[in-house]
């Protein structure tokens, strides 16, 4: 049975170190020109695999390119992790797109549109009442 404390500790360490690697060690214009952050890390119970969820303000194809670039660089990132952290075996890394931020922004935009529409309808009703 996996030790949840150990998994949480390893996840936290990996998140910290991968964040530093993304900020300082990758020479990729696409990654440097777009704000990206690690939103979540999932490490398997045997510490063999790690999914890294990336959130970004970028949209559409740029988001896909960011994830593709990170997955192309995953062996390099794993190599640097191996030099920086003391683990018997560094987990296999997989980068995934975390669409929660984009979905949240989409919901906020819809709510704002609904609020504006309701406000416009209320204004029209008030104008009609004033004219009567």
From Swiss-Prot:
Molecular-function annotations in GO: ribosomal small subunit binding
Domain of life: Bacteria
Gene3D superfamilies: 3.30.300.20
GO terms for cellular component: cytosol
UniProt key word Cytoplasm: yes
Keyword tags: Cytoplasm, Ribosome biogenesis
Cross-referenced InterPro entries: KH_dom-like_a/b, RbfA, RbfA_dom_sf, Ribosome-bd_factorA_CS
Main location group: cytoplasm
Annotated coiled-coil segments of the chain: none
Assembly information from the UniProt record: Monomer. Binds 30S ribosomal subunits, but not 50S ribosomal subunits or 70S ribosomes.
Family to which the UniProt record says this protein belongs: Belongs to the RbfA family.
Name of protein: Ribosome-binding factor A
Organism expressing this protein natively: Prochlorococcus marinus (strain MIT 9515)
């Amino acid at each position: 049975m996996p030790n949840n404390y150990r998994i949480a500790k390893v996840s936290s360490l990996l998140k910290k170190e991968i964040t530093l690697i993304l900020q300082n060690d990758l020479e990729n214009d696409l990654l440097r020109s777009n704000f990206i952050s690690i939103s979540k890390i999932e490490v398997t119970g045997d510490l063999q695999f790690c999914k890294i969820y990336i959130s970004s303000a970028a949209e559409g194809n740029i988001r896909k390119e960011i994830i593709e670039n990170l997955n192309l660089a995953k062996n390099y990132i794993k190599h640097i992790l191996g030099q920086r952290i003391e683990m018997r075996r560094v987990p296999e890394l997989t980068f995934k797109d975390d669409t929660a931020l984009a979905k949240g922004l989409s919901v906020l935009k819809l709510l704002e549109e609904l609020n504006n529409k309701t406000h416009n309808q209320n204004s029209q009703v008030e104008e009609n009442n004033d004219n009567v």
